[in-house]
Structure formats: structure tokens, C-alpha cells
Amino acid sequence: MAMPLCLGIGELMVELAPSDSPDHLRRGFAGDVFNTLYYARMLMPADWQIGFHTAFGTDTLSDDMMDFIAQHNIDCTNTPRIEGRSPGLYMITLQDGERSFSYWRTISAARLLMRNPDLLAAKLADARFIYLSGITLAILSPADRQLLLEMIAQVRSADRTVFFDSNIREKLWPDGEEMRVAIKAAGAVTDIVLSSLDDEKRGFGDADAPAVADRYLGWGAQAVVIKDGAAPSLLVDGNDAVWLPPDMVHLPVDSTAAGDAFNAGLLAGMAAGKTICEAIP
């Protein structure tokens, strides 16, 4: 089997969301890295390989999750299965039109995605594009987090591009200092950082988007894209900085996973040979 052109590393969770019936919930599967792969799959030719590395339990929900991934033409073979573990789960509740989230992920199998690093090493060696996020880092133990970043550093080269979406979620981290140390370490092995100004202001106290870009470039990233809601995004690629206004959307249907979809468009565009500036949606 051909190895993936694009490899994502992260967690896929069970989603319970309100349905048309007030007494029932709709089950789905979602997670930031997987969402990006899912949307990228829609944009890429069917014969281009996309792979997802995580860890699964040995329960029925894990079986259903693996079937779901395969049905969408994303490869999750050669991935650890952990006895006694199950997928993480989150539930969406609506109150006065506002969404809130409750999470259950303590025994998520994905926390042990580094259980057999040789499986991941083989995939990294053949992937053209590597994609991970701050949530990927947050769910791992410090030792596994360090190992993952060391493995990425070993394969990073001129013909391979590493994407990192900082996706700062403070509640996933033991404390702010551990989060900042991990994000800095990821920035040092990343080619393209994808982030949002709101996240970076909360996590690092940056005053504006240029300050965010300067920090990541100083750590070793080659390019940085900072989104700012309906305001223009900032792309800094080496010494070149460009402000990119978003396409006008008068009435968004749903902002869920909007950042993941943005990243998918960039990933698919660069996989097709576009420059980073050309590929930004």
C-alpha cells in the first residue's frame, strides 16, 4: 500500500450533539487534526494518500471509529490498539443558542499514540506533509511529547513540510508554563505555524499578530499564518509579510471547525504545488 502523502497526528473523539429530537443525541466523530484531514480529503484527488496516526481502544466504539475513518478514504492502519482504553468523548449542549462542551477523555486511547513509536516512524519517513496541533501535544505525557517532537525533527527536511496548529486549549494543560514550553518546542521543529490571534494573546500575551509571528520565527518556524476572525490574516514567510483579507461571508451557517477547514484548504493547496500565499483560502 502506498504511504500517505499527508500524515496527521492527533486525537479523534466521539461527539454527542443535539438532534431534532430533544430526548436524543446524535453520535459523530470529530477532532481538530482529523477534521483538517477530513476536509483536505474533499479537496484532494482520491488517489492522493492521507493518513491519520492516533491510538484506538479495543472496544466497539473504537471499531466504529476505525470504520468511519476508512469510509472517508483516510488510512489509519498500523496504528496502536490499547487494551482497556476507549475513545475520548465530548457532548455539545445548547442554551439560548450558545454552544458549550463537556469532555470525557481521561482514558482516551489517543493519549497513548506513542505506545509503539516504530509504527509512527515508518509513516513519518514516507509522509510529504506532516500535520499536528497543540491538542496533540496536550494529551501526551511529557516524555511522549518530547519523543514525538524529536522524531519529527529527525525527518524534517527540504522535501518535507511540517504544519503545526497551536490550537491553545488551556484546560488541557496542567499549567500555563508547561503549555508554553511545549508550544515553543513544537515551533522549533515546524515549517508552517497556523494560529489565531485570540489563542496567542491568551496563551502568550502577545500584543498583535506581528508579535506572534516574530516569536514563532525566532523559535525556528519558516512561516506563520495568524488568523483574526473576520479581520485580515497575517502571513509572514521569511522576511515577507502579507495581510490577507478573508472572503466576505454575510451569514455564516456554522463556525464549527472553521479553523480546521481553513487549514485544510492551505494544506491541500500546497500539496497541489501552490505557494503558501497562493494556497491560503
Feature names for model-found ranges:
Residues 1-7, 205-281:
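Conserved phosphate-binding/catalytic region of the ribokinase-like
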